[in-house]
Curated annotation (Swiss-Prot):
This is Vacuolar fusion protein MON1. It is a peripheral membrane protein. The lineage of its organism: Eukaryota, Fungi, Dikarya, Ascomycota, Saccharomycotina. The keyword Protein transport applies. Disulfide bonds: none annotated.
Amino acid sequence: MEDGAKDDYIKDIYRHASPNADTDSFLGSPTVAIDSTLSTSNSLSNLNLDTNDSSSSPPAHNDDVPDIAEVLQEMLATTELPSSTTDLDYEPELDLVGGHRRNLGQLNDYGSPRADSFVSLDPPSIGTEVEQFLSKKKQFFILSSAGKPIYTLHGSDDVILGYLGVLQTVVSAYQADESGDNLMSFRAGKTLVVVAVEGPLILAAVSKIGESESQLRAQLDVLYTQILSTLTKNQIHRIYANQSNFDLRNLLQGTDVYLDALTREIVNGSPSILLGALEPLILRKSIREEIDGVLLSCRTPSLLYGLIVSDSKLANVIRPKKHSLHPPDLILLFSMLFNTTSFRDGEHWVPICLPKFNSTGFLYAYIHFFSKSSALIQISADKNAFFELREAKQQILSQMEDKGLIKALERAEERGRFKPVDVAVPMVRHFLYKSRAHVQYVMPSYETHYYEPHMQRGLLTFYHQLHAQVNSDSSRGSNNGWRFMHLVRNSCIGFAWITPSFELYCVSGPNVSRATLAASIHSIAKWVSQHRERLFVIGGAVF
């Protein structure tokens, strides 16, 4: 995207935050422009899709690729159909224990994504199903290497099958090429398509909202992690080794609700997924330490990890010394718990694969919501630990109730995030601060500048743009890990500052001087450092 186009794009973000915004101008048309750039794993080559341009040079790949690219261009531009230290369970039993063990799919006989968890990028649906499909600003596709559909964000099988067939053909053409290149991404106008090949699965993201390749690739990794939470990597490879055209939806039946919830979170602009970090619950240090003490005193021999989470925010963790769960696994787990209705009743005992912890085996999670939006999660490698962990839950909640800790959690949840005025930086409207050491982030509430959902969505889209810019080659920085980006627009000013210890992204109003903004940035970093033990979960309860 040229510099002028980038300027117009950012302006459009803030036009989108206005009730009179033109949503089509915000993100461009659904058709694909002629100029296209194609990226492979080992090289970057330019591919001109205009067959009338005799000056274009052929790509350095096999002869089939230009024709395939022309087919893809034509179809997209028309409305015609076209390692762990613990031994894990590799084939979890799905029988009931105490009436509570279910697999993730069985939970969704009655589960669904939360209705309040989605802010659409798109205008109201009009026209035919194909026209609606092509008008979407963002798409995700998951298919097998044989072209069988597994998941799509938008569109029925009747609409998507032709597109998936072309996508599978393009990917296969590059895999068959003797150069050893794999198709990584290609761009057509404002549309960026990013492809990830994970064994027998192909994942693709299509975005018209100015996201970078690395951002889309991180989103695809989250979706792949979601699939691995139900079927391990070994299971998937074994299935397709025996039957290459197998329909994986037969085994994932019932878990599409989690993919729906996760893609909604991505489309909403989730800071957790953007930053690859968890949001902690803001809690007094003394309260957090007291809860840690309860978790340690009630720990059972089979417990591997324990978590207390309030409205997707991490409050406490109990873990083995020198071992931590990975944020991508917890982002996945929190999305399943808090963005669907599957786990809200009673207690649950489910096998789950946490791929960043171990992608080849299952752990078992005991999940219990002890208030409307707070849950106790106990994770074990022992499939027979249900009753042991249930008893531990009763002891934990009894002690927390006696010490007033459940009420303390409820008060912290009611207070929510701190307000921008609490930080005493009046020129800053909003910011994201990520502690790289703790892999956690904090941000103020959206008031008073971003009180409407579409305003919040515009802000988060701008953060994605700022994140992409500061992590690009065009950002200013030094070789010691410091980078910064200063973006001046008509409606706002954005600033990103990356250091070895933190990442900070902030947005101010227009006409704020660079000196004032720099002083505000330093004030934010100082304030976070002063309150770090209240803002972040540091270490947790270690055994």
